[in-house]
């Protein structure tokens, strides 16, 4: 194991990195910069983190003859409001509500287009990830009592960090391909779920403005039908290490 500092869009560096790989996992976060002494999201860098990395990997594929699977951790944000469709499944057309969310769709499409019988591509649309160090109360305290632009009436769509790891292992073991929603079974919407957490922790409730609409009635049935089971289906083990 070793660390390589590089841009994902650098195909030459990517060639060296994946030359002997049989599986590649793409799990990116990026685009955060500093402007006038304050953090801000750079849309160009953000797109390069996702779409650029997908393109860099695609350009490097001739150097990786052993590669048999690509797994990409995308985001539920790709659905946007899903054009008002309810329920929402993997067959529901994506409808990103912002340019930032559009990058997930573009990266998914670029990767899916290169799938062959010998090279499988699995795209996971993950929910909001929680777990040790990212407990619900820790995430909530940053927005408690504040107005935020997101849709409180959209599904909670949360997933434990370790269930993400387990799903990736499951995808490798079963050589999954295609698109899968990856979030647990919490039935509440965002407003109700985080109101319950706020009451428990003595925090002010969030004020959801609903500027960016989210999906409702989203299903995780496809992944469960494939045989995957969640270690934390109800979101109650937020501080637990579920892999130990």
Task: Say what each PLM segment does.
Residues 138-147, 153-180:
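Alpha-helical substrate-binding/gating segment
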Residues 204-244:
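C-terminal amphipathic/interface module of NAD(P)-dependent oxidoreductases
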Residues 55-99:
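Conserved Rossmann-fold NAD(P)-dependent oxidoreductase catalytic core, especially the SDR/UDP-sugar
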Residues 96-101, 127-128, 132, 150-161:
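Glycine-rich "substrate-gating" loop/helix at the edge of Rossmann-like oxidoreductase active sites
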Residues 165-219:
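Mid/C-terminal beta-alpha module of Rossmann-like enzyme folds, strongest
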Residues 109-132:
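Conserved beta-loop-beta element that borders a ligand/cofactor-binding pocket
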Residues 20-71:
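NAD(P)-cofactor binding segment of oxidoreductase domains
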Residues 1-22:
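Conserved Rossmann-fold cofactor-binding substructure of NAD(P)-dependent oxidoreductases
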């Amino acid at each position: 194991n070793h660390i390589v500092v590089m841009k994902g869009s650098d195909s030459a560096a990517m060639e060296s990195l994946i030359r002997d790989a049989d599986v590649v996992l793409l799990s990116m976060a990026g685009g955060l910069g500093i402007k006038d002494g304050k953090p801000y999201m750079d849309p160009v860098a953000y797109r390069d983190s996702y779409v650029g990395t997908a393109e860099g990997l695609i350009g490097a594929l001739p150097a990786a003859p052993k590669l048999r699977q690509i797994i990409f951790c995308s985001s539920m944000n790709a659905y946007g409001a899903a054009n008002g469709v309810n329920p929402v499944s993997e067959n529901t057309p994506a409808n990103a509500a912002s340019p930032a969310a559009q990058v997930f769709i573009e990266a998914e499409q670029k990767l899916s287009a290169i799938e062959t019988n010998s090279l499988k591509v699995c795209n996971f649309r993950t929910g909001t990830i929680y777990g040790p160090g990212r407990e619900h109360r820790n995430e909530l305290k940053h927005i408690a009592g504040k107005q935020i632009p997101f849709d409180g009436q959209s599904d909670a769509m949360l997933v434990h960090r370790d269930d993400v790891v387990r799903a990736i292992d499951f995808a490798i073991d079963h050589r999954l391909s295609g698109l899968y929603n990856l979030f647990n079974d919490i039935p509440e919407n965002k407003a109700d779920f985080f109101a319950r957490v706020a009451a428990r922790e003595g925090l002010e409730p969030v004020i959801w403005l609903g500027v960016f609409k989210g999906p409702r009635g989203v299903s995780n049935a496809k992944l469960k039908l494939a045989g995957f089971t969640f270690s934390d289906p109800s979101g109650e083990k937020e501080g637990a290490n579920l892999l130990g």
